[in-house]
Amino acid sequence: MQILLAALVAYLIGSVSFAVVVSAAMGLADPRSYGSKNPGATNVLRSGNKKAAILTLVGDAFKGWLAVWLARHFGLPDVAVAWVAIAVFLGHLYPVFFRFQGGKGVATAAGVLLAVHPVLGLATALTWLIVAFFFRYSSLAALVAAVFAPLFDVFLFGTRHNPVAWAVLAMSVLLVWRHRGNISKLLAGQESRIGDKKKAAANGGAQDGGKL
């Protein structure tokens, strides 16, 4: 019962879509209506508003970190922490507050990993940054980071008595699945690079005074 309740709370935390909330608060178009139609920081950046993209990134990462931190703070066992990690991630992917139309989970996964262990989170984030810097594809960086995250976890903590390792693996598999469309575009040479701006509809990306 304790695990179920913790997972439910984590799912609700994950269901807060900062891309949609921040965009609405700043008078921007719904990120689900332009660009990749993904409610995430990369797509919000396509609106031309860097501040909104940064706030989205921080918010999505924070909720992942918060859910796991709360589980640890209240002394829940590792099995519960593992379920909390998966639940907050699923909340971001399929948010109950936004008709289950969520993002792809990169920032939220990063927040979860940072809460599991700072070294794990930083190693995975560094992997993303290196790939993104050299190739300028957010999706490719996310896919590579998703592959390496479980490997980093096993290297740092092993698999014995480590249920969180299975949660990390599950998140990685889900993240790759959510990027299946991006994989097709990458193979076809049609994927957008970081920094590409796609005009938003209705009060969207090219709003006056909105670009930073």
From Swiss-Prot:
Main location class: membrane
Bilayer disposition of the protein: Multi-pass membrane protein
Pathway where it operates: Lipid metabolism; phospholipid metabolism
Keywords: Cell inner membrane, Cell membrane, Lipid biosynthesis, Lipid metabolism, Membrane, Phospholipid biosynthesis, Phospholipid metabolism, Transferase, Transmembrane, Transmembrane helix
GO cellular component, one term: plasma membrane
Pfam families for this protein: G3P_acyltransf
Superkingdom in the source lineage: Bacteria
Catalytic activity, reaction form: an acyl phosphate + sn-glycerol 3-phosphate = a 1-acyl-sn-glycero-3-phosphate + phosphate
Protein localization: Cell inner membrane
Positions of transmembrane segments: 3-23, 51-71, 78-98, 115-135, 139-159
Record-level Gene Ontology MF annotations: acyl-phosphate glycerol-3-phosphate acyltransferase activity
InterPro entries linked to this entry: G3P_acylTferase_PlsY
Single GO BP term: phospholipid biosynthetic process
HAMAP family: PlsY
PANTHER family cross-referenced by the UniProt entry: GLYCEROL-3-PHOSPHATE ACYLTRANSFERASE-RELATED, INNER MEMBRANE PROTEIN YGIH
Subunit field text: Probably interacts with PlsX.
Family designation: Belongs to the PlsY family.
Role this protein plays: Catalyzes the transfer of an acyl group from acyl-phosphate (acyl-PO(4)) to glycerol-3-phosphate (G3P) to form lysophosphatidic acid (LPA). This enzyme utilizes acyl-phosphate as fatty acyl donor, but not acyl-CoA or acyl-ACP.
Protein name: Glycerol-3-phosphate acyltransferase
Gene: plsY
